[in-house]
Structures are given as structure tokens and as C-alpha cells.
Amino acid sequence: MNDFPWLTIIVVFPISAGSLMLFLPHRGNKVNKWYTISICILELLLTTYAFCYNFKMDDPLIQLSEDYKWINFCDFYWRMGIDGLSIGTILLTGFITTLATLAAFPVTRDSRLFHFLMLAMYSGQIGSFSSRDLLLFFIMWELELIPVYHLLSMWGGKKRLYSATKFILYTAGSSIFLLIGVLGISLYGSNEPTLNLELLANQSYPVTLEILFYIGFLIAFAVKSPIIPLHTWLPDTHGEAHYSTCMLLAGILLKMGAYGLVRINMELLPHAHSMFSPWLMVVGTIQIIYAASTSPGQRNLKKRIAYSSVSHMGFIIIGISSITDPGLNGAILQIISHGFIGAALFFLAGTSYDRIRLVYLDEMGGMAISIPKIFTMFTILSMASLALPGMSGFVAELIVFFGIITSQKYFVISKIFIIFVMAIGMILTPIYLLSMSRQMFYGYKLINVKNFSFFDSGPRELFLSISILLPIIGIGIYPDFVLSLASDKVESILSNYFYG
């Protein structure tokens, strides 16, 4: 056990520091913004330092572990720890949240509350990724929903209350299944409740009970991922939310569902996962095609990007369902890759909206000459989204393909069919992404808005775009930087139960 409570400090620091904003001037928007950015940068540096000097990549076991008795009455522990599966998502959370606070500079209404909610969301997300106790995981999972709901309902488009209500109904409703699963799995077959994830990983259950647990957790994580048909909250939410909130949703929140699928469904319930994986494979394949074919019909720019996120999450589901070393590694790489790409596209969509106050693609056109820097960045990041070689998305999707090909679980005909359908989805992706760029930047200038300001990307926006682009290219050129973090943990998960 680590002597210094690194993870506790990393989890508690953002929300604690955010609470001090109550003492800052009410109208001091610049003070609030720079204070929040300073907190995020300090948190990211602290996280990076703690991981660089204390995390051993060749060790698949839990590291920086903390185990404190929290509530004596119900034998509840504050258990924290990281491994190769969670370290990437925690660093991604820190990076995207820091950039999202910088992207939120134009927010002036209730900026103190806005930035506090972002920091509270930050704590909840890192807490979810670093929890080693099932009940603590559930508490952090729920804690993160509260600031998200308020960010959605108070800042955004005209239908923001509708989208926020839809979001909370879906996520809070699915959390009931998560809570039932947590209580059921902890109380089974033991005189004392066991919530420790390390002990639960070695627990075995009757087949029927394991299937019931699996379904409960699957529903909760399918809503967050999202997996069709539980995805309908996502386009509405992205369509109405402020773009800095969209960056956090696409970059981090969706990845929590995929993380839960691996951490709980795959690691704790291996036999049920082996039984359900063919069905998940089918759903993931349908999801790629469905979202890629639905996206071109969306007039709203942010909704079109949201459907592209649904399509890309299909690759993660397929990688998890392949039950192979390359497949799971590819899924983890896609989690990180899409975190950057999704956040970048929503940021650029937001910067365009700041200038023309339009979200409907058929009302745009001919902006390439007026805003060449934004046009260039949007084009490059669209290429990243359609998995151009040299970008992170290409490597992730390619490794997922290898995962399906090398899988021992599926017949050759099944594998050929799945790869064929995935290939169709990859062909549809350039259609909706390139048509989106064409409608925005090419053709005649259709914009008819009074007093619109056509100034190009400023230093802040250019810095933000390049900051997200660099890791996308870096991972595309050298994916082993991410894969080496998780490879030992992936082998540890897969060695437990498959085909043994």
C-alpha cells in the first residue's frame, strides 16, 4: 500500500478548490475563469507527477492503493487504486477537462457556478475511474450526474431543459439497475458484505445469478456508452448543451460506460460476458451502420457529430466482445482516441457557432475563405474521425479488426460477415463527415445573420485545437505509448476465464 494518499488528494482537490470560488467576487468572471484553469492545470500536473514516479507499467496489479475505514456502521471502506485500465482514462479526464475550462471562456452568465460544476464533475469522474470499492464506484458514478444535469439545464440552447431532463431520466433510471447489481453482488454468498473489487474478481456465482447481475450492469453502462437502443438521449443532449459541456460529455462521460463494461462486466462476471459477447458483437456492428447512416440526415451540426460518436463507440463494443488481446487493447485505445477526437470536433463546432449563431448545416456555407484556420483544423480533425492513417482512430480500429480476426470464439463465416458490415460503416463515415465539411465551408455563402462577426481563430482557440490534435497524431504514430500502459492488465483479465 502506498504511504502517501495520492489518489484521495487527486479526487478531492478539484471539488474542494471549486468550493472556494464562493468567496471570489460575484462579478469577477476573469478571476473565476483563471482560477478554474489554474486548478485544472495544477491537478493535471499533480496526477502526472504521481503516476510518473509511482506507477510501474509491467505490474498488472492495483497500484497507489489506499484502504481506509470510512463508515463503521456498515463496514464501508474508502478504497482507491489504479491499474493499466484506469490510468489512461484518468489522464484523459485531466487533459480534456483542462481544455474544456479554457474553451468555456465565452461563458459569462453565472460563470462562478458554471466553473464550480465543471470541477465537481472532474472529481466525480476521476473518483469513478480510481474506485476499488463497488459502493464507492456507485457513489462517484451518481455524484458526477448532478453537475452534468445542471450544466445541461442552465447553459445551452432553447430546448436545454428538455434535453437535461431526458439525460437525467435515462442515466438516473439506469443507475437503479447499477445499485441493485452492486448490492446483489456484494451480499451474495457471504456473511459479511464484500465490496472490494479485488476480492469480487475471484468470486464465482451460479450461472442464472451471474446472468442477472450482468444484465443489470449492462443496462447501466449501455446508457452511458451509449449502446443502441439506449442512445436517444445523446443527440438531444449534444444538440442543446454548451460546447465546453459537449467536450466533457464526448471526451469523458461516454468513456465511463465503456470503462464499466470492462471493469465490472468483463472482469467480475467472465462467464456471463462470454455468453453475451456474441449478442454484443451483433449490437456493436449494427450500431456502426445505424449511426453512420442516420448521421447524414441530421440538420443540426452538433447532432451529426453526436451520431458519429455513437458509431465510433460501436468499435469499442466490438473490441470488448471479441474476447481477444488485440480486441480489448484496440477498444481501450479507441476509448482514448475518441476522447480526443470527439472533444475536438465539438469544440470546433462551438467556435463556429460563436461566430455565426447557427447550428443548422443547410443555413451555412462558404465559410472557408472567411475563417481559414478553423476550416483547416476542422478538416484535419474530420480526417482523424474517419480514421485516416497516421491518426489515432486508424490504429485503434485496425487493432479491433485484428481482434475479430484472431478471435477463437466465432466461426469464420461470422467473422467475415462482421468485418464486411464494419467495412460498410467505415465507408459511410467519410460520406457524412465530408458532406458536413462541404455544407459548412464550401459553396456559396448562405449565411444571412445581422451583425455576425467573421473573425478567424484567435490564439486561445488555435492553442486549444493544436493541443488536442498533437496527442491524436502522437498516438497514431506511436500507439504503444497507450497500449503499453494497459497490455499487462488486459492479459490479466483475459487469462481468468476464457476457453480455459
From Swiss-Prot:
Q: Which protein are we looking at?
A: NAD(P)H-quinone oxidoreductase chain 4, chloroplastic
Subcellular compartments: Plastid, Chloroplast thylakoid membrane
Tell me how this protein sits in the membrane: Multi-pass membrane protein
Q: Might you give the EC number(s) for this enzyme?
A: 7.1.1.-
Keywords per UniProt: Chloroplast, Membrane, NAD, NADP, Plastid, Plastoquinone, Quinone, Thylakoid, Translocase, Transmembrane, Transmembrane helix
For the protein in the UniProt heading, the enzyme class is translocase
Chief location of this protein within or outside the cell: plastid
MF terms from GO for this chain are: NADH dehydrogenase (ubiquinone) activity; ubiquinone binding
Family per similarity comment: Belongs to the complex I subunit 4 family.
Q: Which GO terms describe its biological process?
A: ATP synthesis coupled electron transport; electron transport coupled proton transport
Please report a single Pfam family linked to this protein: Proton_antipo_M
